A protein has these predicted regions:
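Conserved AdoMet/S-adenosylmethionine-binding subsite of the radical SAM
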Residues: 11-25, 34-180
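Canonical Radical SAM [4Fe-4S] cluster-binding loop centered on the CxxxCxxC motif
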Residues: 1-8, 59
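Short glycine-rich or small-residue beta-strand-to-loop segments that form or flank ligand, phosphate
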Residues: 27-29
């Protein structure tokens, strides 16, 4: 947001990116970056597109799910005008979240060239079921969204009742492998303090224990 990242900060970020040709993707994450106004987001997208080695802009947001009206003409305008490859990672945890308004929002995003991926969190009593997760993957794909990550639960104060053990999470993924084609099985990962990227959780298959982004 403008209060957190002023013009001088922006110039410093852009200078750093210009001097780092090994960086080809920029991620807008949060908080929720789509809580920022579209004028500022458009300025950032335009500036990033001016850096020759930046190819992709990836945005992580839950707003298109909880407030599908956020996918407005202004947002679609700057996304559609950007020459960058655009990826939006949405956060859908249960098939019930995919209502008609959300599906329409996803369709509008795809129409302007946005690739849609999903990441979910395994939550006890919400989606810790192979049936629910399989239906979620199928419904996401029907909505033009590829399953991407399935997050193992990270301990959060006041949310221990949602905790699902790594063993149970791995068993869920193995069950999904028997029900779904491989491209619909999300990768089981967790975020570890101090790590710069997500770390896969071993499921007993041939999933390598390496860091991924």
């Amino acid at each position: 947001e403008s209060q957190r990242l002023g013009p001088n900060d922006r110039q410093q970020v852009l200078a750093t990116l210009n001097a780092a040709p090994e960086i080809n993707e920029v991620i807008f994450s949060g908080g929720d970056p789509l809580a920022v106004n579209d004028r500022l987001l458009a300025q950032w997208a335009e500036a990033l597109a001016g850096i020759p080695h930046i190819k992709r802009l990836r945005i992580h947001s839950r707003l298109p799910v909880v407030i599908p009206q956020r996918v407005c003409d202004a947002l679609l305008g700057w996304l559609g005008n950007s020459p960058l490859q655009k990826i939006l990672v949405v956060h859908v945890n249960h098939p019930a979240e995919l209502d008609s308004d959300t599906r329409k929002a996803f369709a509008r995003l795809r129409e302007v060239g946005v690739t849609l991926l999903n990441q979910s969190v395994i939550l006890k009593g919400v989606n810790d079921s192979a049936n629910i997760l399989a239906r979620l993957s199928e419904d996401l794909f029907d909505s033009g969204v590829m399953p991407y990550y399935l997050h193992a639960f990270d301990p959060v104060a006041g949310a221990h009742h949602f905790d699902v053990s790594d063993q149970a999470a791995a068993a869920l993924v193995r069950a999904l492998m028997t029900r779904l084609p491989g491209f619909l099985v999300p990768r089981l990962v967790r975020e570890l303090p101090g790590e710069t990227s997500k770390t896969p959780v071993f499921t007993g298959d041939n999933q390598a224990n390496i860091s991924v982004t």
